[in-house]
Amino acid sequence: MAENNEKYRSFRLACDRCRSHKLKCPQQPSTATGACQRCTRAKAQCTFSPRSRAIKNTQDGGSIRGKAIKKPAKRGGSQSPSAPGSPPPTATENPPQQQQSDQQKPSGSNRWDSPWGPLGTFDVLYPTPQAAFPAAAEVSPSDFSAAMSMGSTFMDCSPFAETSSGFDFQFDMDHPSGLPYYNNSTDPSLAVQSGGTEDDDVPMASTVDNSRCHEKEDCTKKLSCLAVEFQRHLALFNKHSTSHGGADKKGARTGSDGEEAQHWLSTYPIGEILCLSGDFSSILEPELYPHGRAAPVSIDETTNDARGPVVPVGQRDGHHANLSDSGTTIGLEVAHAGHPPPPHLSHHRHCQPSPPGSLPTPTSRSSTAAVMDTPTALLILNCYVSMIRIYSALFAHLHAHLRHPAPSHSSARHRHSRSTLHRRYSSGIPDPALKFGELPPAPSDDVSLRAYTAVRLLLDALQRSEELLGLPADLRCASVSGAPVGARDDDGDDDEEEEEEDTAAAILSSDSEAESLGSSVCVLPGGCGEIIGAELARAVFRQEAQMGSEQGGGGLEVLRRNIAGVKRSLRQRMAL
């Protein structure tokens, strides 16, 4: 027992580490002063409290300071005695921030020589300590508040202090093995896409296609500008109609009134309407179909027989060019031999008429359309509704002029040579300067043939917009399915009866369309239900139908009535 007592110092003479664990300090066998064995094994600095030095060097008042020594020391070892003969610690050697204390071990742990043996050092956890952490001798994990503070030696905060913001610093990317890819792959195509490195920003993995975002913003800007252009042109068309007296529905025009009306119709800017429709389609096609549209194939559901690729929009007349009820189309036979139709209207594939009472329901194979978000869908519908208003006003003006008898002769000032006409619209690109009087005339009735050509061009552009939007059949106007049901085409009806019928239909159009749009559930496969949403489109058109015609509204029913009236007037004037 005596030998064991000689190996250990008393509790009052123990170092800070041993005293904090309430253990006797084992002294070195060679000397009685200096570091103890526990601190030597732990490779830690063996420190002693300055109270021990005061006891040794004090001759007066030793009893008073002895009472202070008998008080239990606090955790952290700030008031522990030092070994006799040890040099007094100074402020530079042991600053208050670097006074170390060990983690408390439970009592009865003397089976190990030291709680800070090989298992308690950082050499086991980190065989090769990184430069970001201090040495193991400077670490004091027992003091929790000091360890978690930003100014302690446990956490090296120098990378954070070098930059202005707390987390705006550059990670060490020299060893990326510790940062695997998000899908545990090493594909070089999934490498980190870093932005500008002027401010030493953190390179982040970008999964968003920035080009697609810019394209979407560009499309939104174009649609917004196009909506403004639609509203401006609608106001101009209405002003153009009222400034020239519009269409007189009470009797036939004679004398100067008839010539003025013909001049007004000849200067009607249909080229601007075609250009607006073309811009609307050109903006929508890359947005709705970013991967392109495959050539659809029309399939007959009764025989499952593929009839080949459908003729592109603008090169077919199976839907809207059928102006007669007998199924015969107005083809090349109505054109005069001296004035052939344009090349892009002369090569049409005539569709076979469908049986009475049945609607053509072709299915098409095309690429999947992109789904629009609600703001973009509302912007598209806004442009489309404005375009519907322009078309409705245009067909109303044409219908008003075609209701009157054809003039005996046509003015020579509206005629153009064949080369001029071929150059103006044979290229297939709409010309905004194209006027109604520049269309190919006929010797007998130039207004009728020009109106027929204008209707063909306008309905082609309208049908292309409907196909791009993928509207259901009940929301279309340029196809057979969108024609009004029960339209009267009797040749014996006079102008007054037709006018009364159109007026009554216009009055009841809002209620009838609102009911039909609310109850209809017919949606084409891959149509508006996927691109925009049939319910959203019906809600917009239902609101449009509730607006009065004096406000430029009326909805799809008014446009259908105007289209049917123009077709009926053309059949009567051209004896079809």
Swiss-Prot record:
<keyword id="KW-0805">Transcription regulation</keyword>
<dbReference type="GO" id="GO:0008270">
    <property type="term" value="F:zinc ion binding"/>
</dbReference>
<feature type="region of interest" description="Disordered">
    <location>
        <begin position="334"/>
        <end position="369"/>
    </location>
</feature>
<keyword id="KW-0238">DNA-binding</keyword>
<keyword id="KW-0862">Zinc</keyword>
<dbReference type="GO" id="GO:0000981">
    <property type="term" value="F:DNA-binding transcription factor activity, RNA polymerase II-specific"/>
</dbReference>
<feature type="compositionally biased region" description="Polar residues">
    <location>
        <begin position="47"/>
        <end position="61"/>
    </location>
</feature>
<keyword id="KW-0539">Nucleus</keyword>
<feature type="DNA-binding region" description="Zn(2)-C6 fungal-type">
    <location>
        <begin position="15"/>
        <end position="46"/>
    </location>
</feature>
<feature type="compositionally biased region" description="Low complexity">
    <location>
        <begin position="95"/>
        <end position="109"/>
    </location>
</feature>
<protein>
    <recommendedName>
        <fullName>Zn(2)-C6 fungal-type transcription factor mpsE</fullName>
    </recommendedName>
</protein>
<dbReference type="InterPro" id="IPR036864">
    <property type="entry name" value="Zn2-C6_fun-type_DNA-bd_sf"/>
</dbReference>
<keyword id="KW-0804">Transcription</keyword>
<dbReference type="Pfam" id="PF00172">
    <property type="entry name" value="Zn_clus"/>
</dbReference>
<comment type="function">
    <text>Transcription factor; part of the gene cluster that mediates the biosynthesis of macrophasetins, 3-decalinoyltetramic acids (DTAs) which feature a tetramate (pyrrolidine-2,4-dione) unit connected to a decalin fragment and that have potent bioactivities.</text>
</comment>
<keyword id="KW-0479">Metal-binding</keyword>
<dbReference type="InterPro" id="IPR001138">
    <property type="entry name" value="Zn2Cys6_DnaBD"/>
</dbReference>
<feature type="region of interest" description="Disordered">
    <location>
        <begin position="47"/>
        <end position="123"/>
    </location>
</feature>
<dbReference type="GO" id="GO:0003677">
    <property type="term" value="F:DNA binding"/>
</dbReference>
<dbReference type="GO" id="GO:0005634">
    <property type="term" value="C:nucleus"/>
</dbReference>
<feature type="region of interest" description="Disordered">
    <location>
        <begin position="404"/>
        <end position="424"/>
    </location>
</feature>
